[in-house]
Curated annotation (Swiss-Prot):
Belongs to the LOB domain-containing protein family. It comes from the Eukaryota. Pfam families: LOB. PROSITE patterns: LOB. This is LOB domain-containing protein 8. Residues 8-109 form the LOB domain.
Length: 120
């Protein structure tokens, strides 16, 4: 973790209305620059629950957890009805469309190859 120095307080300390300590355990995962994303995350989970999740996570998984927490908050902001599940559904739908398009292209390539072979 970096010393406070010139950095701004982390999002967790801002929402808890406390001074961000020099070696804040949350500054690395929720820096000031992510405050707009953290706001939606805070609305969804609440800072106490975020702190609890981060404290129970193994050190090597904390960055992944913080990223997941913020992504989930953003997903619910963008799609208040379906949240992350809606995001996954949209991605799966796009994959299906791209697979169908790829299949069409493969068929056209196959047809063109057959035409070329007939002319040789």
């Amino acid at each position: 973790m970096e010393p406070l120095g010139d950095r701004r307080p982390c999002c967790v300390c801002i929402t808890k209305n406390r001074n961000c300590p020099r070696f804040c355990e949350y500054a690395e995962y929720f820096p000031y620059e992510l405050r707009s994303h953290y706001e939606s995350t805070n609305e969804l989970f609440g800072t106490p629950k975020i702190i609890k999740m981060m404290r129970h996570a193994p050190e090597e998984k904390k960055q992944m957890l913080a990223t997941s927490i913020i992504m989930e908050g953003n997903a619910w902001t963008n799609d208040p009805v379906s949240g992350g599940f809606g995001m996954v559904q949209k991605i799966m739908w796009k994959i299906m469309l791209h697979k169908a398009y790829l299949h069409e292209l493969e068929e056209k390539i196959k047809e063109e190859k057959e035409k070329i072979e007939l002319h040789l």
